[in-house]
Design a protein with these regions (language model features):
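Short, charged/polar connector segments at secondary-structure boundaries
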Residues: 1-78
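Short, charged recognition helix plus adjacent turn
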Residues: 82
Length: 82
């Protein structure tokens, strides 16, 4: 079973192809939800040396970044591709 962890946002790399799918309205909606209810769904990241690569959860990551959070909850997964 995977263990939920807090990852430093500054160490999470978002691949260029993922960044093109960013919707600012969705980020705002998720940020509002996080303010009201906390982060409900962890993101998925994989390790890449000293950093982590985002596998799933772009809008949640950007919402936490927008809110000024230093960390985000997620699961570390074993994945070669994203």
């Amino acid at each position: 079973m995977m263990k939920r962890e807090a990852f430093p946002i500054e160490k999470i790399y978002v691949p260029v192809a993922r960044r093109t799918t960013l919707n600012p309205r969705t980020v705002d909606e998720i940020a509002e939800s996080i303010l009201q209810h906390g982060q409900q769904s962890p993101i998925l990241v994989r390790r890449d040396g000293e950093r982590f690569v985002l596998v799933e959860g772009l809008h949640r990551l950007e919402a936490c970044r927008k809110l000024g959070e230093a960390t985000i909850f997620g699961f570390l997964v074993q994945s070669r591709r994203h």
